[in-house]
Each structure stands twice: as structure tokens, then as C-alpha cells.
Design a protein with these regions (language model features):
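Ribonuclease/tRNase effector modules and their secretory precursors
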Residues: 2-153
């Protein structure tokens, strides 16, 4: 796909656009931006508010941040997709996830976007609550696991 600058250099016969610097690339894909630590912190705050109703605190590993921006995902995983994943999983499986108890492992699978998030539940003695530790995230069709899968469309 041509960028705004490439398109205009080829179609404009006046002053070359190489001398003018556009403020923004209007044709750039919106989903190409990498997710920052701050973005992930905001997603975590949102997920914490959702899952607080069932006594779960959401945490992300450092590997999660690395993997969310990994090239192997082919299409960049967006903040909106992560928020959707937490919202839909809570709506459909919130109480069921809380009943798994400590030391349980499972995968949340969004079949619409093919985003998979393996997680572990750990008991937090300090706060007396379950921690949902999101270990990693990846975009992959037909994700195979031996752990329980919580799927939604």
C-alpha cells in the first residue's frame, strides 16, 4: 500500500513533496502501533475493575509485554482486542474462572480475532485474593493446549 507521501509524489506535478514533511501519514494502518507499558497498565486497571467483582486481581508478566508486540503475531494485537478479551471472558466465564481456585491454568481464546491468552491463577497471601497472571498472549488460529479453554466469539 502506498503511503500518503508516495501517492502524492507520483500524482503531483508541482513542487516535489520530498521538500515538504507531512504531519501524519494518513494511510498508515492504525493497528501497527506497538503497545507500550503504559497502555498495558491501563488495560490491567480495566481488567482489575471487572474481575474485582469475583475477587480476582489481574497481573501481566514481562513476557506478556514482549509477546504482545512480537512479529510472529503477523497482525499487531491492539489494546482494543485485549480489552475485548477481558470484557467478553468476564461476561461469559467470570464466575467459572474464579471457581478454578489457586494453581489452576487455562487459556482464554477469542475466536473472532484468534487471540489466545494462557493464564495461571495464584493465591496472593498479602492481599488475600486470587491473582490472574496472564503469562503470554499470541494471535494464532487453532491454538492447541492441554489446559482448559475458555472460548468466545
Amino acid at each position: 500500500m502506498k503511503t500518503f507521501k508516495q501517492f502524492n509524489e507520483q500524482s503531483y506535478s508541482g513542487t516535489p513533496f520530498g521538500t515538504i514533511h507531512p504531519m501524519a501519514d494518513l494511510n498508515a494502518a492504525a493497528g501497527d502501533a506497538k503497545i507500550s507499558k503504559q497502555d498495558l497498565d491501563n488495560v490491567e486497571k480495566y481488567a482489575d475493575r471487572l474481575y474485582k467483582a469475583v475477587g480476582i486481581d489481574v497481573e501481566f508478566t514481562r513476557h506478556f509485554l514482549d509477546r504482545v508486540n512480537d512479529e510472529r503475531n503477523k497482525k499487531q494485537i491492539t489494546v482494543a482486542e485485549l480489552i475485548r478479551m477481558f470484557k467478553q471472558s468476564f461476561k461469559k466465564y467470570g464466575k467459572k474462572i474464579a471457581q478454578l481456585g489457586p494453581d489452576a491454568e487455562a487459556v482464554i481464546n477469542d475466536m473472532q480475532t484468534d487471540v489466545n491468552m494462557p493464564f495461571a491463577l495464584r493465591w496472593d497471601n498479602k492481599n488475600q485474593e486470587l491473582d490472574l497472571v496472564a503469562k503470554t498472549v499470541m494471535r494464532k488460529k487453532n491454538f492447541a493446549t492441554s489446559n482448559q479453554k475458555f472460548q468466545f466469539k
